Amino acid sequence: MEAFNFRLSNMIKAKRSHLCVGLDMNPEGLGSSNTTIEDLKAHTYKVIDSTYDLATAFKPNLGFFERWGSAGFKWLEEMMAYIGEDVIVIGDAKRGDIGNTAKQYAHSLFKHFKFDAVTLSPYMGVDSISPFVEDLSKGVFILCRTSNPSAIDIQDQPVGEGFLFDKIAKLCVEWNVNNNVGLVVGATAPEEISRIRSVAFGLPFLIPGIGAQGGDLKQSMLQGNKNGDALINISRSISFSGNLSEKSIRETAKDYLSQMRDIINL
């Protein structure tokens, strides 16, 4: 059985792509106050079809499916079957509970929905991580230094001789026994990317914040890919690009991918 981090690294090399397309299917993104779940389904499949050969991974944010209740969960099941197994699919769930609850979340995300990896919050410690890393073929990306403005309120708090995000990075290295642990590090904090990479050798980074949030693509690629792989997540800027056509979505994705390749001479 291949460890998740090996599989991710091999797929990045095979596709020459560090692109992760975020599937944050916001009804307002289609420009109508009357958007239905069927409208969003159709657009989601359009995004997937337009970028499938360009992306190493897709990252559905579960909140945009959960808002529709049982119909949203059915849509998520259908979408996972539609995507198939030729790309990596990361469930952006940000789970963070412990014990039996964490086990149920892991079963739901890995066994039922069949995600290849998920995002997790480390706030409750290793008890909230352990159930998700038992299967080395499944990966986790742990929130370390996120891209949102208020991240500094907690993640930049002093801990010992560093900051909380430093401590999280060091813990993630310890937790990476099965080579299936990665970190979420936002593109809006390029200095922190470099700092965290100096600690977390070999751990993959999932880097959100490019596009609508104004993150630094160049530094994300340069620093994130030192001694490890960086997966660059782009959501709204691709999914709701231009006139929302397949051509517009694909051209935007190709442009981002071209920029990434140029930055690291891939």
What are these regions (language model features)?
Residues 1-88, 160, 247-261, 265:
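Conserved N-terminal beta1-alpha1 strand-loop-helix module at the mouth
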Residues 12-14, 48-54, 77-85, 131-136, ...:
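Acidic (Asp/Glu)-rich catalytic clusters
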Residues 21, 58, 92, 118, ...:
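Conserved, mostly hydrophobic/aromatic
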Residues 26-27, 93, 97-184, 202:
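Conserved anion-binding
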Residues 35-51, 100-109, 128, 165, ...:
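Short, acidic/polar
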Residues 67-82, 98-102, 122-137, 187-198, ...:
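Active-site-adjacent beta->alpha loops and helix N-cap segments on the catalytic face
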Residues 187-233, 237:
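A C-terminal functional module that forms or caps the active site or interfaces directly
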Residues 218-229, 236, 240-266:
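C-terminal helical cap(s) of enzyme catalytic domains, especially alpha/beta-barrels
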